[in-house]
Amino acid sequence: MPQNFYTYAFFNTPDFSMDLPSGNLGKLLLINGKNISAVVEPGISLESSQNDDEQVIKMVLAHDRVICELSRQMTVLPLRFGTYFLSEDTLLNHIESHAQEYQDKLNNIKGKNEYTLKVIPQKVEELAKASGTNGRDYFLAKKQYYEQQKSFFAAQNQEKSYLINLITETYQSSAIIQEHAEEVRFHLLVDRHNKALLLEQVLSLQKKCPHWDLILGEPLPPYHFI
């Protein structure tokens, strides 16, 4: 009878004894291919939990936790939440047929972490009408406020373009940029030994872009570079 093998990550077949973390419900297993191996949890069924939001959240958190713990031991190729195979043979056949692709990806991310730099626009202060201010004075203050607002947004847009161009030029294929309504996110693939340099770069960028708040996240497995 087929048994689901919920799969967390692929990596080079280890030549040392791994310390496997606990899974979502039970123990994890190491499935070794010729050159690429996988960590799996047997018997996990997403279908039985898809209508239970609390259970799904628990599974998502377990998925991320396992990948983070594995990545502290070696370079891993993190798989998307919900990845599973119907049998060990199906998993091994998949690994063998995609071995070169996965090897290339592992070589690209070896010894590196992913950092997310959130760039959040600062807000323009609202114009408050002071008590006792007559109509003409308020009109002039309002006109001045809109001129300042215009200059503020122009500077903000200029700084945004500067950030995007500089990070794209510096990191090239090691940067993924996502623009959202309320912020811009830069996903950066950085060598583990260059964390201090990255922090210095972010501090320097913050000084050059005073109309934005720059927030650097913690190092994570390279989810966006697989």
PLM ranges: what are they?
Residues 1-215, 219-226:
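An interfacial alpha-helical scaffold signature
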